[in-house]
């Protein structure tokens, strides 16, 4: 199996993709940790990567809410004693649920498996909560139900977070995530058009397929640890196809850091989205576009609480 299991001992396990580590995922980790303590055991979260749907339906690329390494760190921060990553491949897909659970030994002595009633794993998704209870009755561990978490009357899911982002509803996405939606990319060379217009932007390329918000202009926060930028440097973020100049259908993410003058090429930026200022639109002239960009910056500074040096923390308090 494409999973390395260290010597953990007695444990309660939960498993999934955990994309975004939204509030429902956090509840799952908390339930697992409580169940583990009650059984004098460790809590273990097993992360499947890539998302199973990418293997089950070749050619599918999941729009991810977090880079892979941040998923693992946030699962740990939520309270899991151990975080294991299982590479989901064709072999793992064909494992029956009882085979997968048995393969956790000898490193893990199962005391429980925590799952939501609608989740499943293993070949043909046979590993339902009911099936795990049957396996546990024979093998000597418990099936632990994690009740779905409802926000505004609806279950929280990564799909729901993506839908909020696709609608440009950053506030709802943030409520579901309990943190600002973000993406991470590397600064690449663009056509320098922003610099020519007086708004030098950092153009981002991604090593994964990020879940992008709706096309538009956003107020955001940027961190560039290697350049001592941030961790909450205010910025305007454009997600769009630049229709004033051309519309080739390729969505670009461009970041304009307020009160920043420096070279960020090849740097890795983490960009948090705070609020959508406006939708993307085509302007009749470059001059009209520049006027709007100035208005966008003025609006951003107003929300931040004035001029140069304004703290991004102010925006976080307001939103």
Region locations from a protein language model:
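Classical nucleotidyltransferase
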Residues: 91-200, 284-292, 297, 310-318
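N-terminal catalytic cores of NTP/NDP-binding nucleotidyl/phosphoryl-transfer enzymes
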Residues: 4-67
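Phosphate/ribose-recognition catalytic cores of enzymes acting on nucleotide-derived substrates
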Residues: 191-319
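A glycine-rich helix N-cap at a beta->alpha junction
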Residues: 67-82
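Glycine-rich, highly charged phosphate/nucleotide-binding loops
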Residues: 63-71, 93-100
